[in-house]
Amino acid sequence: MDMDNYRTKLKKLCIGEKIADIPIIQGGMGVGISRSGLAGAVAKEGGVGVISTAQIGYDEEGFAQDQAGCNARAIRKHIQRAKEIAGGKGLVGVNIMVALKHYAEHVKESVAAGADVIISGAGLPVNLPALVSETCGAKIAPIVSSCRAAKLILKMWAHKYDRTADFIVIEGPKAGGHLGFSREQLDHMDELDYDNEIRQIIVCKGEYEEKYGKKIPVVVAGGIFDREDIAHALDLGADGVQIASRFVATEECDASEAYKQAYIDAKEEDVQIIQSPVGMPGRALRNRFIRQVEQARQPVAKCYNCLEKCNPAKVPYCITKALIDAVKGDVENGLIFCGSNVGRIKEMTTVHQLIQELV
């Protein structure tokens, strides 16, 4: 794409009747990295602000005794607060991990609170259409990392619910957090391969656009850093992009200052692939915590019942504790997920300045 024409090529992101003036989704980041402060600020700029529901109520009173209740309360609170900050601009959504134990409750709370979009990954969201009626106003999207996964979820939704995705998020191998790839794939996948995967997914969804008589926008995620990356995604046929890591080093991000500084200080060689108790590889910053996990299992002192498939007696560490420690500012002894380009982040900015730089 000719960068001189870049601005004229940036179209609004239209998800049915819901419209974001800027085709940028701020990716959901948990625990507590993207809540109402960040999501509301992104929506206010005309983008799609996304709240992560993973242990979102970690700082609510009584969380240690009642995680489910605190999380439900916090989902409502943060969606409403983000919408207030947005002032009627952009869209406010949630990212809900399929691996969560209270997945259905998180979806229902998000719909009731008025989320515009529900994005769901860390597993295939097979039952999402059953939890979100077509008339409720919330739009649904699976996160997929392969054409195979896209075909599978679209086929299942069509067969089981006579319904299709409102949009699709394609998350590539350069993303942060949990990744839909094997360790081997992450070591050997070059960009050319993945561009082809994106093109195949775009072709695959065409069948369902025809069947259901509607456009299914595609949003590309993973390693999107600057205008050139956005232009490249649009050239491949995407309708928008999802960016997460870059929004961490903003004043509005909901993480502690120490967490944001860890991103600013990070170098390319500090990034590594780890195995998560969720059962997927993840990309994170190497620190004391990761070195300790490599040496020995970190016994789980308290189980937060956060994951559907987790045996606290066997997992290498408690992911809830590790992520909460990090978001609160203990950046050496907590888990800091990040995208592959975190080493390119050099300074603190604001959501407004970052979006101006990207558009």
Q: Language model features by range: what are they?
A:
Residues 33, 224-225:
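Residue-level detector of alpha-helix initiation sites
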Residues 25, 175-219, 225-359:
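Conserved active-site-proximal phosphate/metal-binding subdomains
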Residues 2-211:
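Active-site entrance/lid segments in N-terminal catalytic domains of soluble metabolic enzymes
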